[in-house]
UniProtKB/Swiss-Prot annotation:
One of its GO terms (molecular function) is ATP hydrolysis activity. Residues 1-332 are annotated as: A. PANTHER family: HEAT SHOCK PROTEIN 90 FAMILY MEMBER (PTHR11528). Keywords: ATP-binding, Chaperone, Cytoplasm, Nucleotide-binding, Stress response. InterPro entries: HATPase_C_sf (IPR036890), HSP90_C (IPR037196), Hsp90_fam (IPR001404), Hsp90_N (IPR020575), Ribosomal_Su5_D2-typ_SF (IPR020568). Homodimer. It comes from Chlorobium phaeovibrioides (strain DSM 265 / 1930). Belongs to the heat shock protein 90 family. This is Chaperone protein HtpG.
């Protein structure tokens, strides 16, 4: 314990945002009380890492009194909890910055939004958003932090707070560098004054901290750099625990990859494929800009999330990359421009894509799990990583009209089962499998057993058309299929006679007016009365919908309505035209057919008129009985 000096005690008031944040954390983390210990250990390890790193580049730092380690002391009777490190310590300005203000902009708003959505603030979020220290206020009423910076000329300081409106800072005598945190546990959390419980939590969350953690004289953790071990020596249990520690994920990884490279550049890496998409994909609209594996130089962490190690479409990969080919005091700018980093990135990308290919062949079910979670992200690489474009194309998987829901086909498999007459690879894009299969434009292909890829990922409409061709076969939307449907023999009912069809199509044009570009006879429909298609040079329907979502003022392109002259409804309309061309039911039926086609496409802007007209038509039909 440090001695108090005669220096005055300074009182500071938390900012309003900080008060709200403290209240939010304390009242939202009650189901995960053990998180406080994980966060305190993590902060202590970070302080030790900073001291170790700084000592290599700054000869004026105060040396540690003993081993670089974390010490925990418990008093079961008094419910006293103490955790101490010999790390970098803090100055007064650092105390105010680190313990008196919100660590990251936007943190409070983010957590409040989760609370409003009735989502629990789990331990992952606490760690990710830099507010881990404050979780200690869940298990105690008051906290004392005694610290001394390792910088030359530093003084001992004591920070105290009850987590309410204020905190105090005063000078104290402290001989050694580092930080000591002490507090009395609340009665309901007295379990954390028990040695077995503390050991349990340390092994669960902090077993691979790069510094020894002592409870009294007993070391609780296993300090080891797993990525330095040969793959043959890695134990799955250890690897999984290491992944959980570095990623703050509670689940085991789906798979992992051990990499050891010697040559123009030398490095070792241990990379992990998560079971599920990371938090950023759920809450930050897919932003992976600042993600990446941890970068170590000679076992010292340089960057926690190094975005320069992998291309953006692979930054969901967690792990550690350790090299001796960079200097320890490398800056962020040097990392970005370093030819060593560029080479490591190139090698890692090749290794990871090879890993995915291996999973697809040797563990297809595991690959399917990966693809469902991360396929949409990987596809982005088609438009950004042209060096590896061919490899990425081979990784693509699609549902199709010949697969079950949740089952996939590759482009290679598709081409292998194409019929001799088929010259193109056909796809259809939309909001989901059920909607895609209900689209009348599929009828021609399904009636002839022609497989069509079903694209339901929003990203598909941007990346798949860019492939253009595979194995000398062009990829074509079914709306753009290079098929002369008029030459195809259509079976079924006799069509409306040509001399009767012409005036009927004219009636369609009159009824729909400016809503449609043209109305023509369809040779592609089998069981539907009408369908809507784009013109030859028009944008794909799903692409048009996506563009509208991004640019709301974008004018809608007029489409062509195709009419199936063999369908009973069209034949009946022709009969009504013969009987009375001015029958108002004809216009109502035409409008209903058109809006029904829009509804199937997902493009009907309002259903009010559609439902009203449907009721009128049903009333007319029931009256005629």
């Amino acid at each position: 314990m440090s001695k108090k000096t005669n220096a005055p005690v300074q009182e500071f008031e938390y900012k309003a945002e900080m008060k709200q944040l403290l209240d939010l954390i304390v009242h939202s983390l009650y189901t995960h009380p053990e998180i406080f210990l994980r966060e305190l250990v993590s902060n202590a390890a970070d302080a030790l890492s900073k001291a170790r790193f700084s000592s290599l580049t700054d000869g004026g730092l105060m040396a540690a009194a003993g081993e670089d380690a974390i010490h925990i002391t418990l008093d079961k009777e008094k419910l006293l909890f103490v955790i101490e490190d010999s790390g970098i310590g803090m100055s007064e300005d650092e105390l105010i910055a680190n313990l008196g203000t919100v660590a990251k902009s936007g943190t409070l708003g983010f957590m409040q939004s989760l609370q409003e959505q009735k989502k629990e603030l789990d331990g992952n979020l606490i760690g990710q958003f830099g507010v881990g220290f404050y979780s200690v206020f869940m298990v105690t009423e008051n906290v004392t932090v005694e610290t001394r910076s390792a910088q030359e000329g530093s003084e001992g300081l004591r920070w105290q707070s009850s987590g309410q409106g204020t905190y105090t800072i005063e000078k104290v005598e402290k001989k050694e560098r580092g930080t000591r945190i002490s507090f009395t546990l609340k009665e309901e959390y007295k379990e954390f004054a028990e040695e077995y419980r503390v050991e349990q939590v340390i092994k669960k969350y902090s077993n691979f901290v790069d510094f020894p953690i002592y409870l009294g004289e007993k070391q609780l953790n296993s300090v080891t750099a797993l990525w330095q071990r040969p793959k043959s020596e890695l134990q799955e249990g250890d690897v999984h625990e290491f992944y959980k520690f570095i990623s703050n994920d509670f689940e085991d990884p789906l798979d992992y990859l051990s990499v050891s490279v010697e040559g123009a550049v030398s490095f070792k890496a241990l990379l992990f494929l998560p079971q599920n998409a990371p938090m950023e994909l759920l809450y930050r609209q897919g932003e992976l800009e600042n993600k990446g594996p941890q970068l170590y130089v000679k076992k010292v962490m340089i960057q926690n999330e190094c975005r320069d190690l992998l291309p953006e479409y692979l930054r969901f990969i967690a792990g550690v990359v350790d090299t001796e080919d960079l200097s320890l005091n490398v800056s962020r700018e040097v990392v970005q421009s370093s030819p060593v980093m560029a080479k490591i990135r190139q090698i890692l990308t090749t290794k990871i894509l090879g890993w995915f290919e291996e999973l697809a062949v040797e563990q297809p079910e595991k690959f399917k799990t990966f693809y469902k979670a991360f396929g949409p992200i990987v596809k982005i690489g088609l438009n950004t990583d042209f060096t590896n474009r061919d490899k990425l194309i081979e990784l693509l998987r699609f549902e199709s009209t010949k697969t079950g829901e949740g089952e996939f086909v590759t482009l290679k498999e598709y081409v292998a089962r194409m019929g001799g007459e088929q010259k193109e690879i056909y796809y259809h894009s939309g909001a989901g499998r059920a909607q895609l299969l209900a689209n009348p434009n599929l009828e021609y292909f399904q009636s002839r057993g022609i497989e069509v890829l079903l694209l339901s990922d929003p990203v598909d409409v941007f990346v798949i058309p860019s492939i253009h061709e595979y194995d000398s076969k062009q990829l074509k939307s079914i709306e753009k299929a290079d098929i002369d449907f008029s030459k195809e023999k259509t079976e079924g009912e006799e069509p409306v006679a040509e001399n009767l069809l012409v005036p009927l199509l004219a009636k369609f044009r009159e009824a729909l007016g400016e809503d449609i570009a043209d109305v023509v006879e369809s040779h592609r429909l089998v069981s539907s009365p009408v369908t809507i298609v784009g013109g030859k040079d028009a944008m794909d329907s799903q692409m048009e919908r996506m563009m509208k979502m991004m640019q709301q003022e974008m004018p809608a392109a007029k489409k062509v309505l195709e009419v199936n002259p063999r369908h009973p409804i069209i034949r009946n309309l022709s009969g009504m035209m013969i009987a009375n061309a001015d029958n108002p039911l004809i216009n109502s039926a035409i409008r209903q057919l058109y809006e029904g086609a829009l509804l199937l496409e997902g493009d009907l802007s309002s259903t009010t008129g559609f439902v009203q007209r449907m009721n009128e038509l049903i009333e007319a039909a029931t009256l005629s009985r």
